[in-house]
């Protein structure tokens, strides 16, 4: 099974691709991680188009069986609204590719990985490193967060 974890953002969307041999019930392995970045000099609409285009390329390259996306329940600022709009672009693009999608709020991701819904970013990143048997924390932070979302999907299956 191949899982794509996504950490939504307007400037940067983190992504992490995990592979798991379900027959053997193996630990997930990281296939790829990184970011989709958009040009801050462009308008929001153009940036959303960039996100959709780059996500389509990732989907064609990695062919995930499942996608997991971080979900937000509250809006504190106009910047948060842009992130939620970018999240909508991700969800729409995944639907167009008919990829089953699950969503998790930040507290559930923290609880699944670090054992506490109030864990800090470092604790979650250390858990990602441990679960994937990595020698160092994945960089940038957005990619590490996306791997955490993907791992949550595996743990919650």
UniProtKB/Swiss-Prot annotation:
User: What cofactors does this protein use?
Assistant: Mg(2+)
Identify the residues that bind Mg(2+) 1. 7, 142
> Which key words are in the record?
Cytoplasm, DNA damage, DNA recombination, DNA repair, DNA-binding, Endonuclease, Hydrolase, Magnesium, Metal-binding, Nuclease
| Gene Ontology MF terms | crossover junction DNA endonuclease activity; DNA binding; magnesium ion binding
**Enzyme superclass (EC):** hydrolase
- Where is it found, in Gene Ontology cellular component terms? cytoplasm; Holliday junction resolvase complex
Give the main localization category. Answer: cytoplasm
Q: Entry cofactor note text?
A: Binds 2 Mg(2+) ion per subunit.
What catalytic activity does the UniProt entry give for this protein?
Answer: Endonucleolytic cleavage at a junction such as a reciprocal single-stranded crossover between two homologous DNA duplexes (Holliday junction)
Q: Give the E.C. number(s).
A: 3.1.21.10
Q: Report the locations given in the UniProt record.
A: Cytoplasm
Q: Mind listing the GO biological process terms from this record?
A: DNA recombination; DNA repair
Q: Does the keyword Nuclease apply?
A: yes
| Active site positions, chain numbering | 7, 70, 142
| Stored PANTHER family | CROSSOVER JUNCTION ENDODEOXYRIBONUCLEASE RUVC
Query: Which family does the record assign?
Result: Belongs to the RuvC family.
> Which HAMAP family does this chain map to?
RuvC (MF_00034)
Subunit comment: Homodimer which binds Holliday junction (HJ) DNA. The HJ becomes 2-fold symmetrical on binding to RuvC with unstacked arms; it has a different conformation from HJ DNA in complex with RuvA. In the full resolvosome a probable DNA-RuvA(4)-RuvB(12)-RuvC(2) complex forms which resolves the HJ.
Give the function comment from the record: The RuvA-RuvB-RuvC complex processes Holliday junction (HJ) DNA during genetic recombination and DNA repair. Endonuclease that resolves HJ intermediates. Cleaves cruciform DNA by making single-stranded nicks across the HJ at symmetrical positions within the homologous arms, yielding a 5'-phosphate and a 3'-hydroxyl group; requires a central core of homology in the junction. The consensus cleavage sequence is 5'-(A/T)TT(C/G)-3'. Cleavage occurs on the 3'-side of the TT dinucleotide at the point of strand exchange.
**Name of the protein in its database record:** Crossover junction endodeoxyribonuclease RuvC
Q: Which organism is it from?
A: Synechococcus sp. (strain RCC307)
Q: Which gene codes for it?
A: ruvC
């Amino acid at each position: 099974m191949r899982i794509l974890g996504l950490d939504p953002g307007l400037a940067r969307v983190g992504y992490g691709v995990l592979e798991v041999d379900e027959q053997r019930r193996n630990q997930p392995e990281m296939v790829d991680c990184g970011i989709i970045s958009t040009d801050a000099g462009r308008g929001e609409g153009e940036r959303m188009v960039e996100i959709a285009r780059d996500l389509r390329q990732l989907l064609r390259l990695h062919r995930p069986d499942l996608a997991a996306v971080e979900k937000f329940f509250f809006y504190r600022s106009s910047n948060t609204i842009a992130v939620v709009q970018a999240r909508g672009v991700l969800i729409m693009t995944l639907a167009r590719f008919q990829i089953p999608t699950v969503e998790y709020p930040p507290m559930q991701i923290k609880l699944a990985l670090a054992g506490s819904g109030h864990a800090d970013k470092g604790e979650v990143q250390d858990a990602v490193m441990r679960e994937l048997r990595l020698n160092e924390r994945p960089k940038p932070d957005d990619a590490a967060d996306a791997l955490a979302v993907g791992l949550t999907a595996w743990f919650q299956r």
